[in-house]
Amino acid sequence: ADLMRNIDLPMQIEFMEISHYGEEREEAIEVLRDVGTDIQGRPVIVIEDIVDTGLTLRYLLEHLQAQKPSSVTVCALLDKSVRRMAKVPLGYVGFEIPDEFVIGYGLDYGGLYRNLPHIGVLTPQEPKAVAQR
């Protein structure tokens, strides 16, 4: 929402929902909710919170390219390239991060921490403490 408020261009916002099971089984990725607009011949910007292995994003980009947009550009807040398994083009990256589990600013762990106004690192001890609550 912060990003959208700071873009001073006419745009149409669409949301997609992608499901993935496991990190290395690309065949277990599927689109649960697709864009509701015809994107043929139109520029598309994909906004991602975090790009990790790149497998889901690669699937998404192939899915969108099949709809023949004029261009597809990816903007990612966080890039965890150390875990990359699929080469994906990132047009814009906010921050490169190490291989740590991050939470806050929309990122969650078990439905928790998504509402934090900042991004933090979840240490290995914290999930155990949450499970005991």
Please identify what each model-predicted range represents.
Residues 1-133:
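PRPP-associated nucleotide enzymes
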